[in-house]
Amino acid sequence: MALKEYKPMTPGLRGRIDLRKDEITAQKPEKSLTTGKKNRAGRDSRGRISVRGQGGGHKQKYRQIDFKRNKYGIPGTVRTIEYDPNRSANIALIFYADGEKRYIIAPKGLKIGQKIMSGEMATLDVANALPLEAIPVGFTVHNIELTIGRGGQMARSAGAGALVAAKEGEYVTIRLPSGETRLVNKKCYATIGEVGNEDHMNTSLGKAGRSRWLGIRPTVRGMAMNPIDHPLGGGEGRGKGRHPVTPWGQPCKGYKTRKKRNPSDSFIVSRRKKKN
């Protein structure tokens, strides 16, 4: 999907870079696969802020996505490719032979009218879902399960794709987009190909108002607050006065927060690599 730039006729257009909507074929979602979505504005069940910097934004409907891909042996046809405000990737509406409709994440190269399939006997074509044991080494996959039957949890964002690196015993070695190498049970399902809309990372909102449309509120530095609001607040000038910390006093900027005895450590061959 190509990028679209604008003439600098206003300050907001000067830095704006959008995606061209050439792939999008439908403007309204399938009504039977959408539900209402309440804007939590970063609040928890007590009404207190649990995630800062969220709130407002345009009203959205949630599209129910089929992450499990458990229509085994039933062929489906790609009917539309649509925009989804809840994720960076586009989604595709699938009409199955038994009459059911489902949304899936749209992989790169998916075409209208294309036939897709899930199951052990599915071919190794883009958008087909198979168990990892049936996918050859060297293939790129997305929407990867961590637990058998739970549905895809890894490599689901725009442009994401993981590499099937090796197979040994009950596990398959997967190299994730983050650079982490991980063992996954060979019975877990994954979808062939990488997620589409790969140019999403190259877009630019261009103005603060577009962030507000997306429900993103301004991020305030701790140093700019009062002492009552943040450990780095107050004082004369711009000095921090201590090592940078979160509003709750936990060190940040390099401080490791992962549990020392995380059960998943035994499945991680090598940790993710830092990106320059």
From Swiss-Prot:
GO terms for molecular function: rRNA binding; structural constituent of ribosome; transferase activity. Belongs to the universal ribosomal protein uL2 family. One of the primary rRNA binding proteins. Required for association of the 30S and 50S subunits to form the 70S ribosome, for tRNA binding and peptide bond formation. It has been suggested to have peptidyltransferase activity; this is somewhat controversial. Makes several contacts with the 16S rRNA in the 70S ribosome. It holds the Pfam family Ribosomal_L2. It comes from the Bacteria. The keyword Secreted does not apply. Residues 15-31 have a biased composition (Basic and acidic residues). It comes from Treponema denticola (strain ATCC 35405 / DSM 14222 / CIP 103919 / JCM 8153 / KCTC 15104). One of its GO terms (biological process) is cytoplasmic translation. Keywords: Ribonucleoprotein, Ribosomal protein, RNA-binding, rRNA-binding. Part of the 50S ribosomal subunit. Forms a bridge to the 30S subunit in the 70S ribosome. Residues 1-61, 224-276 are annotated as: Disordered. This is Large ribosomal subunit protein uL2.
